[in-house]
Amino acid sequence: MSDANKRINIQIGIEVEVVQKQDQSSGELTEGVVKKILTKSPNHPYGIKVILETGEVGRVKNILDNFLS
């Protein structure tokens, strides 16, 4: 399971890439900063769902901030 699938690795204020619902078929990623974490479970196979500061909603595919190291 990737880091983006574990809620513990997602924090408000970090920079991430998400895939929005309408972009699931194309896989187009949207970059932004996490405003709120929507997924309540500790992990999710398709990525943790978040709201970005822009108001866009998507599932995290990549964590761009390197706070894990």
Residue ranges and their predicted role:
Residues 2-68:
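Basic/aromatic-rich interaction segments and small domains that mediate binding to polyanionic partners
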